[in-house]
Amino acid sequence: MDSNTVSSFQDILMRMSKMQLGSSSEDLNGMITQFDSLKLYRDSLGEAVMRMGDLHSLQSRNGKWREQLSQKFEEIRWLIEEVRHRLKITENSFEQITFMQALQLLLEVEQEIRTFSFQLI
């Protein structure tokens, strides 16, 4: 994973954690948790690709890795929709910028996970 993506994740997570969205703060905390989980999953897939011979290890450690991959893509789609919704309803420019960057990062991560998974298949 390149250092720009790492800093982007850290920056967006930090900024999202500072937002006060009133009654939707639980939803935002859920988004932050899923974002962080997605980052860890993407990192582990990337490491498996780097070791290429690790496919058998990945499969034995998690016999349902394709199912897990499918679940991660569903989480990404949900996060993308949630971020788009937040963009539509917020009028705060700080929040708009944060959610725009989060959306861009999600699209990049989706593409990276897709690339990693094709290399592992």
Curated annotation (Swiss-Prot):
Transmembrane segments: none annotated. One of its GO terms (biological process) is exit of virus from host cell nucleus through nuclear pore. The keyword Transport applies. One of its GO terms (cellular component) is host cell nucleus. Interacts with protein M1. May interact with host nucleoporin RAB/HRB and exportin XPO1/CRM1. Mediates the nuclear export of encapsidated genomic RNAs (ribonucleoproteins, RNPs). Acts as an adapter between viral RNPs complexes and the nuclear export machinery of the cell. Possesses no intrinsic RNA-binding activity, but includes a C-terminal M1-binding domain. This domain is believed to allow recognition of RNPs bound to the protein M1. HAMAP family: INFV_NEP. This is Nuclear export protein. It comes from Influenza A virus (strain A/Pintail/Alberta/268/1978 H6N2). The gene is NS.
